[in-house]
Structure formats: C-alpha cells, structure tokens
Amino acid sequence: MIGPKGARVMIVGDVPNDADFQKGEPFIGGGGYELSKMLQEAGTFREEVLMRYVVMEEGWGSVEELVALKKKDVTGEHVLYRGKHVLPCVVEMVEELKAAIEEERPTVVVPVGNLALWALTGEWSVRNWRSSLMESTLVPGQKVIPTLPPLAVIVQWGMRPIVIHDLKRVVRESQWREIKRVDYSFVIRPDYPTAIEYLAKLI
C-alpha cells in the first residue's frame, strides 16, 4: 500500500498486475496513469490518496482463480466466506484489508473492482453499485463509494466522465465521516391539484 498517513481517501483494487509488482506500487501502467489524471480532474491528487489491492501477493492473475463465481466452479478447496465460495487465502487477504482500514481510518474507501466491493460490503458488481453511498460490512461505520476499475475506462472511453463524476462525489464525501443518506419520499398517483403544484415548481 502506498499513500500518506491521515489520507481521507483509500482506493482498493482487486488483483495487481505485473507492472505493479515490478514497480512496487499499485495502479501502474495505462490504467494507473489514467486514474491519476481522473483524480486530478475530480479535485484531488494521487499523492493524497492511499492505494492498495485486496490481493497483495504475486501468483494470482484474476479474481476467478480466487472466487468460485459459478456453482460448477466450487471445489473441495473452497470455503464459504461472506456469502461466496473462496480459497482460504482470500479470507486472510480480506482480514488484512480490514486491519489496514482500521489502522489508516480513511474517511472514504473506494472499491474499483468486484472483489474489492464484495470484501468491503458483501455486494458484487461495481457497475451496479458505482457512485452509491454505502456502509462497509467489513468495517462497520466505514463509508464506501464504489466506481469502475481504471482499465474499464481504457477499454471503454465513454466511461471516463462517469468515473470522474463518481470520484468527485468521493472528494465531496471525504470532507466528513458521517454517512448522510438522502431520505427519498415519493408521491404515488397524486391528485390533479398536487400534480399541478409539483409541475409549477419545475417550471
């Protein structure tokens, strides 16, 4: 993990690539370079952010090697942990992530991958949960805002403004620790006067 003590934001990826290990630093290469630029456009700098992965050791190439995503992939080696069948080493990795968060106490943790999102919240799919204000189930009280992996932006450039939007929310939310959820209330089947009143407010 790299980044300053007392950082308000921690970004957590899934699995390091070869370039990360060669440089000894997370989020290196094209995706990492783009992440640095997007952070700056969102109002912060790479040097102000903690960065790490769930997986912190060499030898693992993908999430599928660690987590049985389909029933047919489950073997005798897998253990049930946080609702997923995983290799035993994943349990250790997630506990190490928990310890790192408890030690550093960032205001917001940003998972940028499905494994990271699951480790922090028990949910899967950053595409479904991106930009959501969530509370960690791994570290209760910890604020979590997922976004897409940097490599997803390289592959699909149209995702770039979306990730920057998410990171801007991260920067805003990093100003306070409380998880301030919006209390949405909906008016279902309003009568005519109520509908006219609401429409007048929109004009």
Regions inferred by a protein language model and the residue ranges of each:
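A polyanion-binding, active-site-adjacent surface
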Residues: M1-S174
